[in-house]
Amino acid sequence: TPDVMLTEIHRQAKDNPIIHLATLARNKQRLKLGTYGDSLITDSINLNCFNDINQVLVGKNDTRKIMNNRARKFLKFDSEDPLIDERIICLQNDATLGIYNGGTFKIVDRLKAKSPNFYKFGIQDDYSQNEQAFSTSVHKSFFRADIPIPNWKVLKGTQQFDYAYAITGHKSQGSQWKSVLVYDESYVFGDNWSRWLYTCITRAEERVEIVMKE
């Protein structure tokens, strides 16, 4: 589980139902299906969420991979390699580039890589279109399950990214989005289930959709 869970709500307007849902979660009260203002608790997921929602949050890494594969197919990214306009997430801080673990970006260009085992992307902050794009070098293993991740010597001086359509609640800490879909896997976290769910709900500024598992 994450080392730190936020316990103060500060992103939402005071009358936003997100606060009500987050408070229920923090107090370990089970959430009920229904509509809460612009927010929703449901028992099924609609793939249109990858068009309509800013960020999907899950609990398990395996679920994250499945969701990202579904998102890419739904959005018609048919290549096994990352393409222009795809959303990616930083997996490791890089002080030289000024990027941090959990930051999300969009691929805006495909460049010639230094070796066939790497991708070279031009990327831009996911929600700041005015920011200048910069280049990154990423080993293919971070996007391709058929390629093993090499040792640190091979990765030295390069960056680490993965697809960002769905990310774990752990990776979401410190970030915020206008709309969030939470695929509720809080059961994975045992006694900390309510803290995980609270953290995910409070990543949303304006609207949250929670998909309750059966």
Model regions and ranges:
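Conserved helicase motor core of P-loop NTPases
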Residues: T1-Q132
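C-terminal accessory regions
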Residues: F121-E214
